[in-house]
Regions:
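N-terminal assembly/attachment segments of tailed bacteriophage virion structural proteins
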Residues: 1-106
Length: 106
């Protein structure tokens, strides 16, 4: 399993510069996962979901207790996909920017 690491600061989502996002090959299934590292208190105790986008389609996945999830196979078929996060706590809803992930099509 390969893990792609992301950083969350408030409403900003970025790729972790210490993580290798190179040589990701489209068509992978059940292999890629995403892990999110949170800075700040905004996200504490929120229920969190990652949304993965391919063109205009969205695929949402709840994060596990390690703030990770499997990346849906549906977005792993093109030369890129995007990801964002949503958090919900009581009446508060928080969303992040999108991060783009490139893939090699072979």
């Amino acid at each position: 399993m390969r893990i792609l690491d992301f950083i969350v600061k408030g409403q900003s989502l970025t790729k972790n510069p210490d993580c290798d996002f190179g040589n990701i090959v489209a068509g992978t299934r059940g292999y890629l996962s995403a892990r999110f590292q949170f800075y700040g208190n905004e996200w504490n105790t929120c229920k969190k979901a990652a949304s993965f986008y391919l063109e205009d389609r969205e695929f949402a996945v709840l994060l596990d207790e390690n703030d990770s999830c499997l990346i849906p196979n549906e977005v792993l078929v093109s030369d890129r996909f995007e990801v964002s996060l949503t958090g919900l706590k009581n009446d508060m809803l928080i969303k992040t920017t999108k991060a783009k992930v490139k893939q090699e099509v072979v």
